[in-house]
């Protein structure tokens, strides 16, 4: 009846409803079966206890703070922002940190951007999704390493020139939200006696393979 997704089903506007286009065929199928799709995208990224807090927790970061400038929610009066900055319990080299990220984020592969593979990493920034344009914010926080995804070739050169170690763990690390949201929804379901059947998707939507 209802799909809760992180990325919106309709990312690009539909100008012609041609069912030969796979995305349009998917929309038609959803409508035909009366399925509602809700996408919590940047609001989940910004939320306290949301995407970037989950990633920071998975990386074992302590004493976390916001990466980007904060805003204030007009209802709760809570500050919120995208990205987190924190510290590892123990210092690692750049290569060791990349291997650590691969392990704790359950990745088949990742990309490391580093001028010095032996540079110590202790203070870390993380931002789920495509965070290349925010690397200057990581520099302002004087971090040793930045974990994000979708880094372009030229941005990678800019990062090396700035002396910033970056782990491009890919966009798919945001799939961490599936078990987190499932647990949250089941908790609300029990607390409110909603009697809703909740299922966690088992699909792997990462388009990339590592050879």
Region annotations inferred by a language model:
Residues 1-211:
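Hydrophobic structural segments
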């Amino acid at each position: 009846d209802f799909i809760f997704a992180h990325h919106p089903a309709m990312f690009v506007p539909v100008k012609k409803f041609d069912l030969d286009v796979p995305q349009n065929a998917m929309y038609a199928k959803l409508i035909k079966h009366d399925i509602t799709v809700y996408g919590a995208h940047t609001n989940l990224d910004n939320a306290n206890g949301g995407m970037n807090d989950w990633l920071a927790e998975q990386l074992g970061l302590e004493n976390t703070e916001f990466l980007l400038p904060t805003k204030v929610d007009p209802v709760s009066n809570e500050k919120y922002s995208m990205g987190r900055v924190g510290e590892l319990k123990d210092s690692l080299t750049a290569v060791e940190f990349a291997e650590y990220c691969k392990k704790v984020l359950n990745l088949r592969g990742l990309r490391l951007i580093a001028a010095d593979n032996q540079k110590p990493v202790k203070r870390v920034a993380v931002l789920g999704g495509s965070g290349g344009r925010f690397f200057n914010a990581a520099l302002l926080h004087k971090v040793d390493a930045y974990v994000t995804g979708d880094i372009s070739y030229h941005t990678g050169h800019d990062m090396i020139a700035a002396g910033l170690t970056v782990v491009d763990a890919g966009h798919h690390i945001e799939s961490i939200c599936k078990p987190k949201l499932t647990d949250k929804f089941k908790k609300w379901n029990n607390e409110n006696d909603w009697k809703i059947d909740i299922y966690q998707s088992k699909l792997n939507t990462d388009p990339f393979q590592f050879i």
